[in-house]
Regions:
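Conserved nucleotide-sensing/catalytic segment adjacent to the nucleotide-binding pocket
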Residues: 199-248
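Short amphipathic alpha-helices and their capping/turn segments at secondary-structure boundaries
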Residues: 25, 62-70, 222-234, 262-264
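Flexible, glycine/proline-enriched loop segments at strand-loop-helix junctions
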Residues: 108-112, 160-167, 213-214
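Short, high-confidence coil segments that cap the C-terminus of an alpha-helix
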Residues: 3, 73, 185, 234-239, ...
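Walker A (P-loop) phosphate-binding motif
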Residues: 143-190, 288
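Long, basic/Gly/Ser/Thr-rich N-terminal segments
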Residues: 1-134, 307-329, 340-351, 367-370
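N-terminal phosphate/diphosphate-binding loop that engages ATP/GTP or pyrophosphate donors
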Residues: 157, 175-217, 292-297
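Conserved catalytic-core segment of NTP-binding enzymes
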Residues: 109-127, 222-225, 243-343
Length: 370
């Protein structure tokens, strides 16, 4: 199959790991990401993609001109765009996709677009004889008879969770996925969002769990059956699991869903090795000890390794509503200083945005499994 040259659009901080680990996308989709364009307000033309997330260098230069970048590609990879209905870049995105159709570029999405956009682009793509589709990967349908009890999962499970959501987990997961595959292991990857499907994995079935009109018990049994189906379908050597959502509350207003998906996961399967990412904040050792206790006894996810991300969660900015949480992204130098502070307190912690960390975690997993 011919490898198509792809333009990833729009590129924002959250999906930079797709550029950093673009070989995973090429291996799964036969799409080589050769261009990426961010919204104009980002001012990243000519900069390395790592400028957006302050992570390790990607050796991938960003473009600020959608039309020129599109001209060098065969298709558009449409990145997940939150809140289509009131995105400040909505009209710009729609205009660029229309231009792509007119230039006979295929368009591939992470998920179905909200209406009326999805129906509109389906019709528009058909008019110009181009493909407009959602890249999905599903496991075989569940056998309803398997919801009678919890079945054992025999494949080792390596889980990555975040103290807060969007705390460096996604990049860490892709780094671990690449490292495990390079060492020759068959890995079934379950990621926290639809991007997992671009790298040969599956999206965590959060939508299915949220729509189940039943008790926690049924949700837990459903998730267990889902993992059992995955194990039987792929017969992997290891399951790499990215748990969606956070695990610890930010404050009394922002509770990170009270660790909802972490709780369901810990009840549904036995995790063999757990990595917890934390924000770039100087916590007291006593607080981190309490977090470990909570992970072990509240979620049944004993923490084997802590990883420091380069993201800091800032206090809510709306005094009345107390609902908006902002995030700062720090350089490797700032993260290094924070690492030194933790070492002075004898807190063992790894740096999430670091290739050495991926190899270190894999070695620790091997050692634990014996």
């Amino acid at each position: 199959m011919r490898v198509q040259k792809a333009l990833l659009y729009p590129l924002v901080r959250e999906n930079v790991p797709l550029v950093r680990f673009r070989k995973l996308v090429e291996q799964e989709l036969s799409l080589e990401i050769v261009e990426a364009v961010s919204p104009p307000a980002y001012h990243v033309d000519g900069k390395d993609a790592s400028y957006l997330d302050e992570g390790e260098n990607t050796n991938f230069i960003l473009s600020g001109d959608f039309d020129k970048a599109m001209g060098r590609c065969d298709c558009i990879l449409l990145a997940k765009t939150e809140e289509w209905n009131y995105s400040e870049y909505l009209l710009e995105i729609v205009d660029h996709l229309i231009t792509a159709c007119k230039n006979h570029k295929n368009i591939y999405c992470t998920q179905k677009l909200p209406e009326p956009y999805h129906t509109f682009f389906q019709a528009y793509a058909e008019r110009y004889s181009v493909e407009f589709s959602v890249l999905e990967k599903k496991i075989p349908p569940l056998d309803i008879n398997r919801l009678d009890r919890i079945y054992p999962i025999h494949t080792p499970i390596l889980a990555v969770a975040g103290m807060n959501e969007d705390c460096g987990e996604f990049g860490l997961q892709l780094g671990l996925l690449q490292t495990l595959r390079e060492e020759g292991y068959r890995v079934s990857y379950v990621g926290p969002n639809e991007y997992a499907e671009w790298t040969g994995g599956y999206a965590f079935p959060r939508a299915e769990l949220e729509t189940l009109p039943y008790s926690f018990e049924i949700k837990i049994k459903y998730l267990n059956a889902w993992f059992r189906n995955l194990e039987e379908a792929e017969a992997p050597d290891v399951i790499l699991l990215g748990i969606p959502g956070g695990t610890m509350p930010i404050d009394e207003y922002n509770l990170n869903s009270c660790g909802y998906f972490a709780y369901l996961t810990g009840c549904a399967v036995t995790v063999d090795f757990t990595v917890l990412t934390i924000p770039c904040v100087e916590y007291l050792p006593e607080y981190l000890t309490q977090c470990r206790e909570d992970m072990k006894y509240r979620y049944h996810l004993p923490v084997d390794c802590l990883c420091l991300s380069n993201i800091q969660i800032t206090p809510p900015v709306l005094e009345e509503a107390k609902t908006i949480v902002e995030k700062d992204v720090f350089s490797a130098k700032r993260v290094g200083r924070m690492m030194d502070l933790y070492r002075e307190k004898d807190v063992e912690i790894l740096e999430a945005e670091n290739a050495k960390t991926y190899r270190d975690i894999v070695k620790r997993l091997y050692a634990k499994l014996g």
